[in-house]
């Protein structure tokens, strides 16, 4: 199915390119080297990079992408991208990072492929990453239909906008799990992905004050889980009915494992989105909250105020301080310490011990070793014993980011975070672990060498959660227009 999707994307690119009246093609080439010490690449070098930067220190990569952008002023338009990475000391020496085709009709989009996803709502340069989806893991191939941008709702006189969509996809980490699991650890293959969201924006374009409210949900379902000997232990159904059951969601049928019959089919998680903002011509400030839930107890706020709290400011003009973001990620309540599903022997339901991102059968909300959501719920790739699941999800982090222009052509970005970790409800740490991480990046461009970007960055970690790490990062990139054809 994954190869068929790639073939479909390449076919669509060739067909639409050959018949296009107007066609533009841009490129981006990048080289990046990291040198340092410690067991891992510093936290803010590796995380939120789409899985491109290796977790191993003293690593690097070469990257080449070809992209066509959408024409926003046309009723029908399309975009596509092909992005290849060659890596040193990463989990694969060469791989396709992005391959997608996106057709736009008015405000609607039909998308197929794998494309890096950053936070839908918050500052994409400075946010630490959403609780549900961030740019922390490698992209998941999927097919999507929806409204990717806020669109005016008819008959609301310019006061109500909506965005949202539905997608189904495939996890592509079967080989990764088999290679990196330790003996005695279970793994899964052919897992499926589902996501749906709807978000409303309340506020008139002519007024500065606005509010945002919505829900974003995702599901891991289907596939097969194997024990350490490679024996099939759980086979999840993945027929048409299962696609409908994860959309609603509903409990699994008789052919589903007992856990899916007692609860709902698949591993469900999501966020409620709330924000209040104030926007002027050249700046925007907003306060926001993502309430995270991993089951129905979280949906009814039994996990209190777990989630991501943030305050961000963004200025559009060049200035020494153009963007500032402060965030607090809290995942310490989890509805209480333990879970008990009602049974004939003990007819009591205790909906607690939410065990964020984890699952009773699946390894959890992880793709190729990286947490799909916030990096503060420690990614399984940090597990030195080959365990593919989460070992630290009871955690709290304080985070800050700032960026701006020092002089023409010279920009900076500073990220700082401090995190405490308690382990999990089922395997708590003996002592609370701490981690401080920071990064400072300088990037330089000059009008005489158009399209070139040179960057230098330093970062370090201090603590006992992922250890003491430090490194310098050197980067160079070149982007520009490759083709611009106007056919008559």
Residue ranges of predicted features:
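Surface-exposed loop and membrane-interface regions of Gram-negative outer-membrane beta-barrel proteins
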Residues: 18, 74-105, 117-136
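Transmembrane beta-strand segments of Gram-negative outer membrane beta-barrel proteins
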Residues: 20-62, 72-82, 164-168, 454
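Outer-membrane pore/translocation modules
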Residues: 24-50, 107, 122-129, 134-136, ...
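Outer-membrane beta-barrel pore domains
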Residues: 259-272, 277-488
């Amino acid at each position: 199915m994954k190869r068929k999707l790639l073939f479909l994307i390449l076919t669509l690119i060739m067909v639409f390119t050959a018949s296009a009246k107007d066609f533009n093609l841009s490129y981006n080439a990048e080289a990046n080297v990291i040198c340092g010490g410690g067991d891992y690449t510093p936290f803010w070098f590796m995380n939120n990079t789409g899985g491109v930067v290796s977790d191993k220190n003293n690593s690097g990569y070469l990257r080449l992408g070809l992209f066509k952008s959408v024409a926003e002023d046309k009723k029908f338009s399309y975009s596509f991208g092909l992005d290849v990475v060659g890596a040193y000391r990463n989990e694969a020496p060469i791989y396709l990072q992005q391959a997608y085709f996106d057709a736009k009709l008015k405000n609607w989009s039909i998308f197929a492929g794998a494309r890096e996803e950053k936070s839908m709502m918050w500052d994409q340069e400075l946010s630490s990453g959403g609780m549900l989806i961030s740019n922390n893991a490698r992209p998941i191939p999927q097919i999507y239909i929806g409204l990717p941008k806020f669109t005016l709702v008819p008959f609301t006189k310019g006061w109500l906008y909506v965005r949202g969509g539905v997608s189904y996809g495939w996890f592509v980490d079967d080989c990764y799990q088999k290679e990196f699991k330790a003996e005695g650890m279970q793994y899964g293959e052919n897992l499926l992905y589902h996501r749906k969201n709807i978000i409303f924006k309340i506020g008139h374009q002519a007024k500065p004050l606005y509010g945002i409210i919505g829900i974003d949900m995702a599901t891991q379902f289907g596939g097969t889980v194997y024990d350490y000997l490679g024996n099939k232990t759980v086979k999840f159904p993945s027929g048409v009915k299962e696609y409908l059951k994860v959309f609603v969601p509903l409990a699994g049928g008789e052919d589903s494992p007992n856990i899916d019959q007692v609860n709902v089919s698949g591993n469900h998680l999501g966020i409620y989105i709330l924000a209040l903002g104030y926007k002027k011509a050249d700046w925007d400030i907003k306060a926001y909250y993502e309430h995270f839930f991993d089951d129905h107890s979280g949906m009814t706020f039994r996990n209190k105020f777990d989630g991501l709290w943030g305050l961000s400011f963004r200025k559009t003009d060049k200035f020494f301080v153009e963007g500032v973001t402060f965030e607090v990620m809290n995942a310490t309540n989890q509805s209480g310490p333990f879970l008990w599903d009602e049974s004939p022997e003990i007819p009591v339901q205790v909906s607690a011990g939410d065990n964020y991102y984890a699952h009773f059968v699946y390894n959890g909300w992880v793709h190729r070793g990286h947490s799909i959501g916030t990096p503060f719920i420690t990614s399984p790739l940090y597990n030195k014993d080959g365990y593919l699941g989460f070992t630290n999800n009871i955690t709290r982090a304080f985070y800050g980011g700032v960026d701006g222009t020092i002089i023409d052509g010279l920009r900076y970005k500073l990220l700082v975070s401090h995190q405490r970790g308690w382990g999990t409800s089922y395997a708590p740490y003996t002592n609370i672990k701490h981690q401080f991480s920071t990064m400072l990046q300088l990037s330089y461009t000059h009008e005489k060498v158009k399209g070139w970007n040179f960057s230098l960055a330093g970062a370090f970690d201090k603590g006992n959660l992922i250890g003491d790490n430090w490194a310098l990062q050197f980067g160079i990139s070149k982007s520009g227009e490759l083709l611009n054809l106007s056919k008559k």
